[in-house]
Amino acid sequence: MLALASAARAGDQGDPEQSCDGNTFQMVECLKAKTAQWDKRLNIAYQQALKDAVPAQRDPLRAAQRLWVQYRDANCLYYGMGEGTIARLDAGECMRSMTETRAKELEGLGHQ
């Protein structure tokens, strides 16, 4: 029961567009859940982009995605190393927003 109440206060984690509210722990957990949702969309879009790509595009796409993951992780680590509890929120929002942006970018590849 308590976990359900906490999740409800932390925003509707089922809606990736809804904001995360609550205390720091609840907001961090909400951001993790939203990042996981966007990561799932990203992985689906990536697999579809690989499938739709002509053979000559596949290796560059794989390389770009590997480098993008490294960049995202390093970039968000920078925010996570800040001072205070806000750094955890900054890092979580960094992961969520960068993952969302990349997912939407890859989803758009099929429309070009």
Which residues fall in each region the model found?
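Classic N-terminal secretory signal peptides
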Residues: M1-R9
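N-terminal alpha-helical modules
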Residues: A8-Q112
